[in-house]
Amino acid sequence: FSLCVGVLADETTAAEPTDETAGELAGQIVILHTNDVHGAIDGYAKVAALKADYEAKGAEVLLVDAGDFIQGTTSVSVSQGATAVELMNLAGYDLVTLGNHEFDYGMDNLKTIFAKAEFGVVAANIKLNGAAAFDANKVVELADGTKLGVFGLATPETATKANPAKIKGVTFLAESELYACAEAQVKALTEAGCEYIICLGHLGIDNESEPNRSIDLLGKVSGIDVF
């Protein structure tokens, strides 16, 4: 298998596969990702169509979201994110990690809405009362036996951006602890036989986010194939 990565935008459209295109992507792994959707749920139909199009052409498709999907519009906020989870189930998402806005409605709400999720939730650097709050990673095994190792990282800035009452007991590994966490995930997934290591991260990009930005992490941690 070879690996392709795609980013989805609102303009995404998908064409029906023809006899000529069916099977043309056999042997390809396609990773589609969204992030910072912020309740723009109208785009999920396009996401689902694009995933189906790639699959119809023979590709193995992994559809992921890198956080901030349960907040931002009335369409999702009125249900405290439950509507977003329902539509992401229908769109065929495989894995997500968490953004800071996932904590707008509190940890208990996350547990409630994710209980109905048909996709995995990975976040290796989030602790609840000192213990892992979510699964750290997921091994995805493809039809030919190829293994993809995916781990999640949430921004440590959530600790200062979220309402303290909503994240009581929740801590986020940051700086050197964040790097060590990522290194441990790479090691564990490599030892599990994963051919590709994918970090699904919701980390800052601005200067004020240093040293917890994606570029800071990638400068310190080796072995990540896709971020």
Give the label of every model feature segment:
Residues 1-10:
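Sec-dependent N-terminal signal peptides of Gram-positive bacterial secreted proteins and lipoproteins
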Residues 10-227:
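Acidic, metal/ion-coordinating pockets
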